Amino acid sequence: MKTAASDAGRDPTCITPAVWLFVVTGRSQQEVAETISSEAAKAFALNLPAEMWASHGVQHPLGDDFSGGQDLVPQTLDEPTVLSYIKDVPLSLLKDAFLTGTPDDVIDQAAEWRDHGLRYLVARNASILRPSLRKSLASNAPFFEILRGLKKL
């Protein structure tokens, strides 16, 4: 990133390495697994580029040239089509796309990003994708625990 900034005539020291990542968390690995294997989480995978799908051994249902969410036109997809597209989404793809696990797991994953130069993380709670509204709302507690832990990194 710093090389690209320098090549573009920008001061590389003025660039803050940042990323926007979704978090799937819960009080147990079972809660995390329930969320990440939900239809809603799998539908989110349609936003991921074909290249990322291919790295997990599957073809993106919208084609090999699909570059991500900016190419997705959701109003052209009906429910049966989406359900057919997501039936083969590998959980490994979702685990690669999200920070996942218990609060301690997610904080450890964020620390790896920090150790590779990240200085600003925008964490979004995707744990609300759980099939149960009650459990979706309850996911805020471990997510807030993560936010408190991230402040200490």
Language-model segments: residues:
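C-terminal helical cap(s) of enzyme catalytic domains, especially alpha/beta-barrels
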Residues: M1-A4, R130-L153
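An alpha-helical appendage that flanks or caps ligand/catalytic pockets
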Residues: T3-E112
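Positions that flank functional sites
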Residues: W20, I128-L129
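Structural motif
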Residues: H116-G117
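Short secondary-structure boundary segments
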Residues: N125
